[in-house]
Amino acid sequence: MRLLSVLLIGFLCLAGTYAQKYQLSPAYNDPYLTDDKTGTHDFWVQNASLPVFYGFHDWNFQDNSGIMEINGDEMHITGKIYPTVNMGDCHRYNVDLVFKKDKSGNVMPKKELRESAYVPHGPIDPATWKYYTFVQGKWTGFGCDPQNVVFSGAEGGMPLQLGYGANGKNGDNGISVWLIYGYTIVDINCNIRPIITQSPTQPPTQPPTYPPTQPPTQPPTQPPTYPPTYPPTYPPTYPPTYPPTHPPTYPPTYPPTQPPTQPPVQDCSTLECPEGFHCEIVNNRRTCVCDTTVPPTHPPTQSPTYPPTQPPTQPPTYPPTYPPTYPPTQPPRASCDNVRCPRGYHCECNHWENVARCVRNEEPTHRPKPPHHGCRPDSCARGEKCICVRGKIYCIPKTTCDQVRCPRKHHCECNRKGQVFCVPDCPKLTCKQVGCPENHECVSRRGELHCVYVRPPTGRWGDDLSDLGYNQASVEAAIDAYEAQRGQRPHNNIPSNNLHQENNDNLGDGFYDGVEIGFADGGFDVNDLNGF
């Protein structure tokens, strides 16, 4: 009895430390649940131009080496990855990521599928997802030119999410998380499939309590634990031919010398299966079996009908309006496990049509955008620039031309967006090389050339007299006095035969184009104005 208790306690301790393992595979893109064109990768790198990624965006686990092990509250992801675009490339990495179960209960799920895929419109329920926060992780390189990639955390502090539809690509059971390396993001999108391992066989919890069904045919192999009432004088010559009149009232104090003829009955009450699996007894052994039936997205509109227990005695008088009474058998769910595709192709499983096809690998043209950071126009003061590093906002001074030293024959310029550039110097021009428009002339001011407007001459007589050094007001007063003395009208009404001019210009417009003005009766010369 004590031995059985020790064995039972040891088995319970082993069951408490039993770890569940999952096989990781690339998450395919389901066009019925998402508009995203990417998919079928385990890891996707946002900035593949960094030297540690060798120019490759997509990385997958090699030879089904991706394993996710959950032991209590700790998750451990391991495996070997290679670039999917060039499978013959010699760059390889060993993956080692550690996560811890999040128990805060205030995590917002990252929904990357269409809104119609989630409840109440679709079958995916984010309330059933589990979350694991990042602890540590790295890629250790091997092969040619090995390098190491050490991750600093998760984008925005978002944890890894696990469940049906959590991979962000389809509705299967999977995981997804955005890890940070420097200033770039490494996206994980994987489907998971549990690896069924047989748990250790439980010893019998109680000794057998049933009495023997037949009398013993041979004497006991060991002496009884209690002394006999009197010593036997000789061994019996033949076994007794009749059974005992009544069974023993107490169990034996020692374990049976022979094993029981039947194994102990297994019970599913103590075996916990992962999501998507249930316990069944097969050949008297407990095992976790995959759920083959897909739960309906809406309740049935009618109650199911059952086949009749007896055949009808009379044929029906009218044809039935309902479908056959026997339920259709559920076809097996399509799987890519046994499908081998040629080079350059991969297997995709369409659960809506329940078929598995080999499709050509395509270079992804669209990448998921990382979550927007919190930088706003008013986050920093004037002259500072806002940046977001690992989910935190920092204000750094903007670069100006005072802080930039350009090479020889170059100078610094700053555009409207505050960006600073070193541009080559232009050769200096002279006014002889600049062509200005009409009525403009070239002028050099502070080392810069400008075309300025030059007012053309108006041709008025006052301007000509002023150019000769006469005062315009005095000249007009002298002309008015002279005309008043002669008793004549102003010059614009003088007949054209009473005056003459050197240039024979028309005086009807009221302006004197020439300098000399003469009259027929003796004349008036401009030199006579010296007395005024």
UniProtKB/Swiss-Prot annotation:
Renumbered residue ranges of the record's region Disordered: 197-265, 297-320
Domain Follistatin-like: 267-289, 335-359, 400-423, 430-452
Reported modifications of this chain: O-glycosylated.
Domain comment in the entry: The N-terminal part (1-200) directs accumulation in prespore vesicles. The C-terminal part (333-532) binds cellulose and cotE simultaneously and specifies incorporation into the coat.
Signal peptide annotation: 1-19
Effect of T233S: In strain: WS576 and WS380B
Task performed by this protein: Required for incorporation of cotE into the spore coat and for the formation of the outer layer. Has a cross-bridging function between cellulose and other coat proteins.
Cellular localisation: Spore wall
Key words of the record: Glycoprotein, Repeat, Signal, Sporulation
Biological process per Gene Ontology, one example term: spore wall assembly
Principal location: other
GO MF annotations in UniProt: cellulose binding; structural constituent of cell wall
Assembly mode: Binds to cotE.
Composition bias type Pro residues, residue spans: 201-263
The keyword Chloroplast belongs to this UniProt entry's keyword annotation: no
SMART domains registered for this protein in UniProt: FOLN
Effect of P315S: In strain: WS576
Gene: pspB
Stated name of the protein: Spore coat protein SP85
